[in-house]
Amino acid sequence: MDSWLLSLLIAGVVFAIFQLRTVGQRPAGCPPGPPTLPIIGNLHQIPNKNTHVQFKKWADEYGPVYSLVLGTTIMIVLSSDAAIKDLTRGVESTHRAQICISVPWQAAGFAWSLCDTWRQFRKLFHSFTHLGAAKSYVPYQDLESTSMMVSLLDNPDLVFDHIRRFTTSLSTQMIYGFRTPRTDDPMLLQMYDGFEKWSTLIGAGPAKLLDVFPVLRSLPAAIRPLYSHALALQKKKSELSFGLWQDAKRKVEDKTSKPCFCVGLVQAQAEEGLTDHVAGMIASSALEAGSDTTASTLTGFLQAMVLYPAAQKSAQASIDRACADRFPTIADMDNPETQYIHACVKESLRWMPTTILGVPHAVTVDDEYMGYRIPKGAGVVYNVWAVHMDPRRYPNPRAFDPTRYMQDLASSAESAQNSDVSQRDHFAFGAGRRICVGMHVVDRSMFLVIARLMWAFDISKAVDVDGDDFVGGILVRPRPFPVKITPRSESRAAKVREAWAACQVLLDQGQQWKQVPEGMPFTTYTGGD
């Protein structure tokens, strides 16, 4: 071998060894964190289950801003309200971190970066969910929550299926223009199966390796079975998303659609040149955002009612003062007597935050905070659990105690805009420019369901329940548990059935809306405004 070639080879090996020596080390100036090991950094310390518990322990030890070294990746963990507010200013950390395994699930990453498609999605979805638009969906929320109540009378053992059907049917009606009237609907089952498989997959050890060692992504597919599995899941998701979009688009063009998000999306496609692929994924993302997380939060509320019967009695007394023997309606939101119900909504979102560690974001420019260096490309995680379990913000934080919000009259959106972040109600909807724009819809849906549940039913435990037993990965929910749901009285059960009977005149034989609900606009899309 020529001496120059040998020298080049030796130099390459030395350089590679030198580079490997730095992998797994915490860069100078970064926030503190647990000790690292060569190559893997802190990867071995990240538990596969109950990650939020360990992240909270590290926050207690290292402070509100700490760092984790995950192979070649730096993760900055924000564990206080002030840190989350300060580090979500402007555009510095608004890109979503690209999680390798989730890229195919997210349609090759379209939703993960601050790009034109993301801006289009935000603009479209805001026009669809702002306060004025949210109020127009009351007929949908009223019918779906009434359907859920009568289903609980008929089949109380399927309570968690009824919750999922409620949130899914409300979402498909608002987004695509059709109801999902059955708990065994194939689309519903496929969607939630995909949610669960993806959430489990993204938290798996091999998936983490692909994230923290990008070089592994170039390995042959045959030795990356997890990534191939993700591609297979994405293929099923794309087929479902594209089919739902094409059907909704056809109905809009045929003028047979009901008012929904896709009416505006068809207009936006023509005006802004969106492809069918992008339009379908935008609609699908809206569906996912509106169904799974709300279902998990409502499941958490049920669990809280089992664990904290005194809170249930207070909620029932609140709605009884407001409604007496009248079936609750959305108008009861404005009744001062229902403040405890509003407090239950806020406390449910605090006590059971489904995005328990937020959604990973990425810093787009070098930054500095509290004297620490925040390097460009670092992942940023909002440690929502740590903030929600901070006893300085919420005394006795693991207790479900709606009274902590009895003086809080602000909506979620109003609270998120409060310049004093210490007064914000919770961080379940995120922060910064990526905050959930569907807050108005969620607040109203949860109020109506909780008010009607508390008015119509007693909720009690069938067996002992562990309030800290969660399942899932990126998105979590309480592990399913036996619960006993019984009508508070025969007269109230009859009132529920009367309300559902009144809804039947609105529906055809397929349980779809016969006509456009009175006063509901076909679209709230405002074009390029």
Swiss-Prot record:
It comes from the Eukaryota. It is found in: Membrane. Its EC number is 1.-.-.-. Its main location: membrane. CDD domains: CYP64-like. GO terms for molecular function: heme binding; iron ion binding; monooxygenase activity; oxidoreductase activity, acting on paired donors, with incorporation or reduction of molecular oxygen. Its cofactor is heme. Gene3D superfamilies: Cytochrome P450 (1.10.630.10). It is a single-pass membrane protein. Coiled coil: none annotated. Heme binds at C436. InterPro entries: Cyt_P450, Cyt_P450_CS, Cyt_P450_E_grp-I, Cyt_P450_sf, Cytochrome_P450_fung. The chain crosses the membrane at residues 4-24. PROSITE patterns: CYTOCHROME_P450. Keywords: Heme, Iron, Membrane, Metal-binding, Monooxygenase, Oxidoreductase, Transmembrane, Transmembrane helix. Pfam families: p450. GO terms for cellular component: membrane. Belongs to the cytochrome P450 family. PANTHER family: CYTOCHROME P450 MONOOXYGENASE ALNH-RELATED, P450, PUTATIVE (EUROFUNG)-RELATED-RELATED. Cytochrome P450 monooxygenase; part of the gene cluster that mediates the biosynthesis of the enfumafungin-type antibiotic fuscoatroside. Four enzymes are sufficient to produce fuscoatroside: the terpene cyclase-glycosyl transferase fusion protein fsoAthe cytochrome P450 monoxygenases fsoD and fsoE, and the acetyltransferase fsoF; the cytochrome P450 monooxygenase fsoB and the glucose oxidase-like protein fsoC do not seem to play a role in biosynthesis of fuscoatroside. This is Cytochrome P450 monooxygenase fsoB. It comes from Humicola fuscoatra.
